[in-house]
Amino acid sequence: MIDLIDVSKIYPVKGSDDVVALDHVNLHVKAGSIHGIVGQSGAGKSTLIRCLTALEKPTFGSIIVDDIDLSQLRGRELRQARRKIGMVFQAANLFDAKTAGENIEFPLKVAAKKEFTREERKERVRELLALVGLEHRGGAYPSELSGGQRQRVGIARALSDTPQVLLCDEPTSALDPESTRAILSLLRQVRDETGVTIVIITHEMSVVREICDSVTLLKNGGIVQSGTIEEVLADPGSPLAKELVPAPSVDELDVADFNRELTDREIAAQSSSAEPKTSAQASEDGNILLDVIFTSHPGVPTGSNMLNLAAKLGADVTAGTFESMGSVQVGRLALAIPAAQRSSIIDQLRAQGAHVEVRSL
């Protein structure tokens, strides 16, 4: 459905180095999927979405939507191709002087004026209001709607001309948690009922966990990692996998305590009935804290099996999280283990397919 082939976008700067906003980006988004694009500010997300909507032309490369290279189109052909792409903004960007229904109808009156009669437009508006759960609010003005309701109107407006692709630019970042969950559920419903391909630009990994089938991580204009959720989680030590399943919270003082070497005073206190220990020997009496990530793909233990293994190895589970994303169950544990058994325990955990790191402050 969507293919970016070696796409670069470079902005020349007079008297300074050029700004490379996108750097040889290659990406495939499957038809009918929900794909997340994540990254910090300056990663290239905004430039990418402007290129996808053909508001910006890439300096190099091709952007293909439904087998049409947008970067090669001009004039009327480009305007027609853009109609295949609907856009949902961070703020709904509704016309304040128009009702919800009139906002939804507006694209049909402008871009498709000759293709629909007035009655056909009104019927389309009724269908879309029902789809987004606002069938009784079509006559309300934006000022009379909540933030979540305004975003629903924005989604309906983006769908008015029956696009094949729906681009969502930070669609939930201005919403409260309850409205965020409702909008994400609506987007999934829209995909399921219409078959539209959805691309979500976001900095919130919770959005990816909740709704996406696949995800791409951008950094400095390039792709760091990309794949389906299952592919990403199959490599639990990868940057995206670590972001998708955050490390369970452990008090920093506990982390420091688990990783510290015993002080000379503690060494002396332990030496009443034995020869004083050296610092190196004493450090072997302490604990260290491990960060363990595992998934339930074939050949890897489930969460309960991993907990049983941790207990068998003498590890103390100080915190843990378990998530189900797509067809994969993924878990992340903070394990306190005896420093003297570090190598043996880490080897046994890794032998079971877990990704293991020593946590530090």
Language model segments and positions:
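ABC ATPase NBD coupling module
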Residues: 70-86, 110, 118, 232-236
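A short, surface-exposed alpha-helical micro-motif characterized by mixed small hydrophobic
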Residues: 208-210
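Helix-to-loop junction immediately C-terminal to a conserved catalytic motif
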Residues: 53
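ABC ATPase "signature
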Residues: 226-227, 235
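Conserved ABC ATPase "signature" region
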Residues: 68-69, 105, 109-112, 118-136
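Conserved signature/switch motifs of ABC ATPase nucleotide-binding domains
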Residues: 140-143, 160-161
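Catalytic Walker B motif of ABC-type/P-loop ATPase nucleotide-binding domains
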Residues: 166-169
